[in-house]
Amino acid sequence: MKIEPIAFESLGVRSQATLVETKDVRILIDPAVSLAPRRYGLPPHRIEVDTLVELAKKITEKAREADVLIVTHYHYDHHDPGYVVPKEIYRDKVVLVKNPESYINPSQGKVRAPKFLRAIKGLPKEISYADGKEYRFGNTRILVSHPVPHGADVRLGYVIQVFIKDGDSSVLFTSDVEGVPSEEHVKFTLDTKPNFLVIDGPLSYLVGRALTEDQLQVSVKNMERLAKSGLETMVVDHHVLRDLKYREVLSGLYDVAKSSGVKVTTAAEILGRETLQLEAKRRELFAQDNSPAKIPRNLASLLRIDQEG
């Protein structure tokens, strides 16, 4: 099994796009990418936009190679109706999506999910509401969790977690659980016992606004529990990498993982690259070069033309 992070905060954007390749099937999870519209009161920097364009192109290329595309929920860093990544990536694919009709908050259930499903209508070879289901492609098994809250409560909706097993190798993709804040989030990992875990980590940069200090500590403690559950590797990225002090936040996890023989890494590190954290460094970027930028309006069309060419 090959697990390849495509776009994450450590690579410079908001995303969790991940490619999993087994002997039987190529699976691309959450093929989307976005930027924080404001951070520290600042818009995206030119370097962030350039990085987004580069990674949107890579997602488009990887999607072209994939057999199965999975959408775990309807936030724009996890799904795209054709704004940044061309909707044509869904053509002739098996598409597994979060059920848009149950366990979903109003903004996703009434607006985003319907808009996305209308946008890709007629493109996929097959589309399936994946919540709580199991799929097989040759000897590869895809098990999807029942919906769990996007964080400590349900204000931001629900997500589905994805477990993929091929022989002795297995990976679990948590989606946006914000560092496993409850038993509901922990259970799927403990039940499936993956070798490899891709997890988003807590929203530590929003303590006092989106979560309390107590909730942050519970999330980290639960991540430490997972590190002792038989894992070999934990890719910890996405939400927690929006915090420049993420290593300090996760210090207990690093200690527990080391004593348990578990490798804790960012997406960038596992690819042998520098951890960028461009959003978290936005003030620094503007101090060095005052160059705000906007995502090109026709980016998805340009990428589609580029792929066709």
UniProtKB/Swiss-Prot annotation:
Q: Name one Pfam family in it.
A: Lactamase_B
Q: Which InterPro entries match?
A: Metallo-B-lactamas, RibonucZ/Hydroxyglut_hydro, UPF0173_UPF0282_UlaG_hydrolase, UPF0282_hydrls
Q: Which domain of life is it from?
A: Archaea
Q: Where are the transmembrane segments?
A: none
Q: Which SUPFAM superfamilies match?
A: Metallo-hydrolase/oxidoreductase
Q: Which family does it belong to?
A: Belongs to the UPF0282 family.
Q: Which NCBIfam families match?
A: PRK04286.1-1
**Stated name of the protein:** UPF0282 protein Msed_0584
The upper taxonomy is:
Archaea, Thermoproteota, Thermoprotei, Sulfolobales, Sulfolobaceae
